[in-house]
């Protein structure tokens, strides 16, 4: 049978399975593909196919992830499943696999466990705002009161980390039964809940314009050009933009031309690599590391709290721990900025392989917002990967 080409006729959503080890994340993923395959919305993926996740290198960090795609009547999904707990931690902090929402798999027989809590916390930190709960292995629980108790526990846990524990859908069932006995109503219910509860993300082109500046040069007689890849939004000739970062004050200019592949355009959009001609800006007034942005959409900051994964020695990271006051480079978008680290109270040092919250103060401000990813580098090599969880000032 010929492969159908990817039709973009449905909204696209990225999701993933999260939860404690052995609660059935991968089995649930397999059950979803089998159930949706009956309606022609997926190719069947067995547990083994998903479980032998290929190793991927994301910014030098080794992560095992399985990517599965499927569709319901309403949407097209890309679904990520990780075999190991460490893979989840790395995945969520580095943003290797973006998630618009998540399916939290909890064994009804065991209830919430330590990694259940940790994954919920991570999801809340990295901007996954919607979680649908699947209480798996319900066939192993004879007492309906016990099921209610577990559901209550999970809802309380979600509320504790800022999710809407009262409103989020909880679907009860057995992924294994769905696979082995074709008893897949619970999976249909689960996907209906995902369809209805996890909102379609705002497309990158609908967000306010932002382009990190990669290079700057002068065209004689025309002015200064900043080049880079448009991260989000749309830019039109004649738009006013701000120049943000690397300095305390915010610059302002008007776009007098947009060029792509040596052709002049009227507009550029998210994903385009462009050169933007800036009115009245001198060559030395703009530099790599700044961003061009829609006025008022992003501001420069020096102090923030970040959730960071510290690379292990085997991943090319440090061989030794670091301590309070450590001063590496923080790589945001297109440039390195030196910053100093303050560790949480009671934490003496950070070992390679740890993940931790840290307070950072940069020596120059960077255009920054929550959920912005960064790398920590030392002498040009990456030693950590992080995400901004809150801006201090």
Swiss-Prot record:
<keyword id="KW-0479">Metal-binding</keyword>
<dbReference type="InterPro" id="IPR005225">
    <property type="entry name" value="Small_GTP-bd"/>
</dbReference>
<dbReference type="Pfam" id="PF03144">
    <property type="entry name" value="GTP_EFTU_D2"/>
</dbReference>
<comment type="similarity">
    <text>Belongs to the TRAFAC class translation factor GTPase superfamily. Classic translation factor GTPase family. EF-Tu/EF-1A subfamily.</text>
</comment>
<keyword id="KW-0251">Elongation factor</keyword>
<keyword id="KW-0378">Hydrolase</keyword>
<keyword id="KW-0342">GTP-binding</keyword>
<dbReference type="InterPro" id="IPR009001">
    <property type="entry name" value="Transl_elong_EF1A/Init_IF2_C"/>
</dbReference>
<dbReference type="GO" id="GO:0005829">
    <property type="term" value="C:cytosol"/>
</dbReference>
<dbReference type="InterPro" id="IPR004541">
    <property type="entry name" value="Transl_elong_EFTu/EF1A_bac/org"/>
</dbReference>
<dbReference type="GO" id="GO:0005525">
    <property type="term" value="F:GTP binding"/>
</dbReference>
<feature type="binding site">
    <location>
        <position position="26"/>
    </location>
    <ligand>
        <name>Mg(2+)</name>
    </ligand>
</feature>
<dbReference type="GO" id="GO:0003924">
    <property type="term" value="F:GTPase activity"/>
</dbReference>
<dbReference type="InterPro" id="IPR027417">
    <property type="entry name" value="P-loop_NTPase"/>
</dbReference>
<dbReference type="GO" id="GO:0003746">
    <property type="term" value="F:translation elongation factor activity"/>
</dbReference>
<feature type="binding site">
    <location>
        <begin position="81"/>
        <end position="85"/>
    </location>
    <ligand>
        <name>GTP</name>
    </ligand>
</feature>
<keyword id="KW-0963">Cytoplasm</keyword>
<dbReference type="InterPro" id="IPR041709">
    <property type="entry name" value="EF-Tu_GTP-bd"/>
</dbReference>
<feature type="region of interest" description="G5">
    <location>
        <begin position="174"/>
        <end position="176"/>
    </location>
</feature>
<dbReference type="Pfam" id="PF00009">
    <property type="entry name" value="GTP_EFTU"/>
</dbReference>
<feature type="region of interest" description="G3">
    <location>
        <begin position="81"/>
        <end position="84"/>
    </location>
</feature>
<comment type="subunit">
    <text>Monomer.</text>
</comment>
<dbReference type="InterPro" id="IPR004161">
    <property type="entry name" value="EFTu-like_2"/>
</dbReference>
<keyword id="KW-0547">Nucleotide-binding</keyword>
<keyword id="KW-0648">Protein biosynthesis</keyword>
<dbReference type="InterPro" id="IPR004160">
    <property type="entry name" value="Transl_elong_EFTu/EF1A_C"/>
</dbReference>
<feature type="region of interest" description="G1">
    <location>
        <begin position="19"/>
        <end position="26"/>
    </location>
</feature>
<feature type="domain" description="tr-type G">
    <location>
        <begin position="10"/>
        <end position="202"/>
    </location>
</feature>
<feature type="binding site">
    <location>
        <begin position="136"/>
        <end position="139"/>
    </location>
    <ligand>
        <name>GTP</name>
    </ligand>
</feature>
<dbReference type="InterPro" id="IPR009000">
    <property type="entry name" value="Transl_B-barrel_sf"/>
</dbReference>
<comment type="function">
    <text>GTP hydrolase that promotes the GTP-dependent binding of aminoacyl-tRNA to the A-site of ribosomes during protein biosynthesis.</text>
</comment>
<dbReference type="InterPro" id="IPR033720">
    <property type="entry name" value="EFTU_2"/>
</dbReference>
<feature type="region of interest" description="G2">
    <location>
        <begin position="60"/>
        <end position="64"/>
    </location>
</feature>
<feature type="binding site">
    <location>
        <begin position="19"/>
        <end position="26"/>
    </location>
    <ligand>
        <name>GTP</name>
    </ligand>
</feature>
<dbReference type="Pfam" id="PF03143">
    <property type="entry name" value="GTP_EFTU_D3"/>
</dbReference>
<protein>
    <recommendedName>
        <fullName>Elongation factor Tu</fullName>
        <ecNumber>3.6.5.3</ecNumber>
    </recommendedName>
</protein>
<feature type="region of interest" description="G4">
    <location>
        <begin position="136"/>
        <end position="139"/>
    </location>
</feature>
<keyword id="KW-0460">Magnesium</keyword>
<dbReference type="InterPro" id="IPR000795">
    <property type="entry name" value="T_Tr_GTP-bd_dom"/>
</dbReference>
<dbReference type="InterPro" id="IPR050055">
    <property type="entry name" value="EF-Tu_GTPase"/>
</dbReference>
<dbReference type="InterPro" id="IPR031157">
    <property type="entry name" value="G_TR_CS"/>
</dbReference>
């Amino acid at each position: 049978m010929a492969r159908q080409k990817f039709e973009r006729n449905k909204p696209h959503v990225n999701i993933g399975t999260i939860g404690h080890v052995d609660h059935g994340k991968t089995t649930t993923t397999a059950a979803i593909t089998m159930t949706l395959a009956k309606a022609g919305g997926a190719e069947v993926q067995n547990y083994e196919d998903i479980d032998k996740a290929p190793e991927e290198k994301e910014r030098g960090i080794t992560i095992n992830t399985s990517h599965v795609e499927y569709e319901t009547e309403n949407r097209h999904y890309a679904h990520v499943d990780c075999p190991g707990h460490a893979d989840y931690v790395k995945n969520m902090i580095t943003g290797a696999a973006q998630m618009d929402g998540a399916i939290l798999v909890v064994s009804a027989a065991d209830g919430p466990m330590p990694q259940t809590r940790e994954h919920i916390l991570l999801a809340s930190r990295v901007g996954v705002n919607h979680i649908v709960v699947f209480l798996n292995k319900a066939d192993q629980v004879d007492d309906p009161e016990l099921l209610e108790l577990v559901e209550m526990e999970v809802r309380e846990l979600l509320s504790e980390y800022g999710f809407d524990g009262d409103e989020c859908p909880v679907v009860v069932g057995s992924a294994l039964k769905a696979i082995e006995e074709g008893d897949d109503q619970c999976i249909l219910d689960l996907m209906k809940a995902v369809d209805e509860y996890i909102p379609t993300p705002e497309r990158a082109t609908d967000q306010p314009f932002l382009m990190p500046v990669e290079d700057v040069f002068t065209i004689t007689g025309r002015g200064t050009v900043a080049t880079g890849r448009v991260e989000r939004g749309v830019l039109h000739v004649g738009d006013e933009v701000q120049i943000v970062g690397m300095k305390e004050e915010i610059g302002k200019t008007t776009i007098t031309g947009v060029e792509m592949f040596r052709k002049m355009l009227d507009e550029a959009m998210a994903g385009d690599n462009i050169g933007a001609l800036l009115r009245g800006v001198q060559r030395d007034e703009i530099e790599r590391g700044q961003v061009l942005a829609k006025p008022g959409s992003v501001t420069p900051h020096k102090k923030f709290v970040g959730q960071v994964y510290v690379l292990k020695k085997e991943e090319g990271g440090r061989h030794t721990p670091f301590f309070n006051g450590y001063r590496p480079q923080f790589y945001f978008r297109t440039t390195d900025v030196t910053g100093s680290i303050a560790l949480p109270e009671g934490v003496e040092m950070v070992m390679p392989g740890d993940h931790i919250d840290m307070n950072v103060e940069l020596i120059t401000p960077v255009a920054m917002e929550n959920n912005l990813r960064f790398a920590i580098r030392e002498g040009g090599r990456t030693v950590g990967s992080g995400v901004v969880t809150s801006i201090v000032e």
